From Swiss-Prot:
Record field: catalytic activity: a 4-hydroxy-3-(all-trans-polyprenyl)benzoate + H(+) = a 2-(all-trans-polyprenyl)phenol + CO2
Record key words, sorted: Cell membrane, Decarboxylase, Flavoprotein, FMN, Lyase, Manganese, Membrane, Metal-binding, Ubiquinone biosynthesis
Active site: 290
Co-factor: note: Binds 1 prenylated FMN per subunit.
GO cellular component terms attached to this protein's record: cytosol; plasma membrane
One GO molecular-function entry: 3-octaprenyl-4-hydroxybenzoate carboxy-lyase activity
Membrane topology: Peripheral membrane protein
Entry protein name: 3-octaprenyl-4-hydroxybenzoate carboxy-lyase
Species the sequence originates in: Yersinia pseudotuberculosis serotype I (strain IP32953)
Length: 498
């Protein structure tokens, strides 16, 4: 599966630069708003990753738009193109529910997958590049880092690509998650994690098991691409993100123990923030412009106190912005969509395709095409999408179509909705379900409704009426006209080029 390997972020950047996928910007650019505007224009044009070498007021370069195209997401996962991410999804589906070999030949066919599993354990180092420079105590100062202030009405600079590492009580496995963090002071950040996310669950369990005790936290900035992408990929609960990163990378993830706690961080990370959350220490976070295209409301979240900053020599700060799609999370969603498909198909073989349109904020609307086998089949698939993977817990709309519809073509999907649906019969509404806290359209924060649209052809049990047959030209006629088409010269060469 692996075709490209990177030991660290710098290794990846070198390859991107060789391929014209990285642009160095030497002009002084301000992290306050200017970087966002440049990054946004570049991403919308399908441009390269950006390395701002001279941020105004800082000596540390800033990396933006690293995963600003689906191709670069695929490259970060060790693949040459997005279509190959289906193989990543197949591997995850296998790891989620491995099928035992049915015989010697089947065992032989599965050997490559078993060999990849050998790369899953982490490799622990005694020293690491991420600890080449150390600040602690009074020397800790987050203002040394050129944290971007992305939008005019944002409350403060925002750490956007922090890989947060936590461990719940009595757990061996660490959790890795990407949570935005508002800069609150020279040694304090606000950790905005939603209650169902791994870091928040670890913290809740810690508070129950160790009342009053500080909760250890580490945040890695600028990890290698495999580790970053593993943190946003739907890995099985039994598999750690570090282990999956090893599979993607083709060799074990190298980690090192923090200086102030027992958490293990990526050894090659550019910057690591170590510290703790004091139980009950909360602060109002926001407002911030987010991936919906709006500023979100203010809410209280835990305060992360930083006791140590460690970093590499000549560290690079990895950052991004979020806004109305397309933004970097939306682009990543398009690529990771290919990972989801095989996982869903293993559980629901009738699924032909699954698509999360980026304009739907990457997860709020899903289009599913199926090989329909019985009356009510579409409703079963809706319920399956909402319940099978927690990544779709916040998906508000699920549209189910037949397999003659292209899930990724709105012309097809809208035609199916308007010709195969009766709004009363074919719409499913479910109230009081979990909803994204950023969704201000829901009547209650974190709680709202979901809608399923059955845009499939209806079976006799679903309607007493004779169902329409799609118009289709005779194949012999199509073949004759294909052969005659160029001779007809209906379009001139000039018109054809248009």
């Amino acid at each position: 599966m692996i075709s490209m390997k990177y030991r660290d972020l710098r290794d990846f950047l070198s390859l991107l630069e060789q391929r014209g996928e990285l642009k160095r910007i030497s002009q002084p650019i301000d992290p306050y708003l200017e970087m966002t505007e440049i990054a946004d224009r570049t991403l919308r044009a399908g441009g390269p990753a950006l390395l701002f070498e001279n941020p105004k007021g800082y000596s540390m370069p800033v990396l933006c738009n690293l995963f600003g195209t689906a191709k670069r997401v695929a490259m970060g996962m060790g693949q040459e193109d997005v279509s190959a991410l289906r193989d990543v999804g197949k591997l995850l589906a296998f790891l989620k529910e491995p099928d035992p070999p049915k015989g010697f030949r089947d065992l032989f066919d599965k050997l490559p997958k078993f060999k990849q599993v050998l790369n899953m354990p982490t490799k622990r180092l005694n020293s690491a590049p991420c600890q080449e420079q150390v600040w602690q105590g009074e020397d800790v100062d987050l203002s040394r880092i050129p944290v971007m202030h992305c939008w005019p009405e944002d409350a403060a600079p925002l750490v956007s690509w922090g890989l947060t590492i936590t461990r719940g009580p009595h757990k061996e496995r660490q959790n890795l998650g990407i949570y935005r963090q508002q800069v609150l002071g020279k040694n304090k950040l606000i950790m905005r994690w939603l209650s169902h996310r791994g870091g928040a669950l670890d913290y809740q369990e810690w508070c129950e098991a160790h009342p009053g005790e500080r909760f250890p936290v580490a945040v890695a900035l600028g990890a290698d691409p495999a580790t970053i992408l593993a943190a946003v990929t739907p890995v099985p609960d039994t598999l750690s993100e570090y282990a999956f990163a090893g599979l993607l990378r083709g060799h074990k993830t190298e980690v090192v123990k923090c200086l102030s706690n027992d958490l293990e961080v990526p050894a090659s990370a550019e910057i690591v923030l170590e510290g703790y959350i004091e139980q009950g220490d909360m602060a109002p976070e926001g407002p911030y412009g987010d991936h919906t295209g709006y500023y979100n409301e203010i809410d209280n979240f835990p305060v992360f106190t930083v006791t140590h900053i460690t970093q590499r020599q000549d560290a690079i700060y990895h950052s991004t912005y979020t806004g109305r799609p397309p933004d970097e999370p939306a682009v990543m969603g398009v690529a990771l969509n290919e990972v989801f498909v095989p996982i869903l198909q293993k559980q629901f073989p009738e699924i032909v395709d699954f698509y999360l349109p980026p304009e739907g904020c990457s997860y709020r609307l899903a289009v599913v095409t199926i090989k329909k086998q019985y009356a009510g089949h579409a409703k079963r698939v809706m319920m399956g999408v909402w319940s099978f993977l927690r990544q779709f817990m916040y998906t508000k709309f699920v549209i189910v179509c037949d397999d003659d519809i292209n899930a990724r073509d709105w012309n097809d999907v809208i035609w199916a909705i308007t010709t195969r649906m009766d709004p009363s019969r074919d719409t499913v509404l479910i109230e009081n379900t979990p909803i994204d806290y950023l969704d201000f359209a829901s009547p209650v924060s974190g709680l709202g409704s979901k809608m399923g649209l059955d845009a499939t052809n209806k079976w006799p049990a679903e309607t007493p009426r004779e169902w329409g047959r799609p118009i289709k030209m005779d194949e012999d006629v199509r073949a004759r006209i294909d052969a005659l088409w160029d001779e007809l010269a209906i379009f001139s060469d000039k018109d054809a080029k248009r």
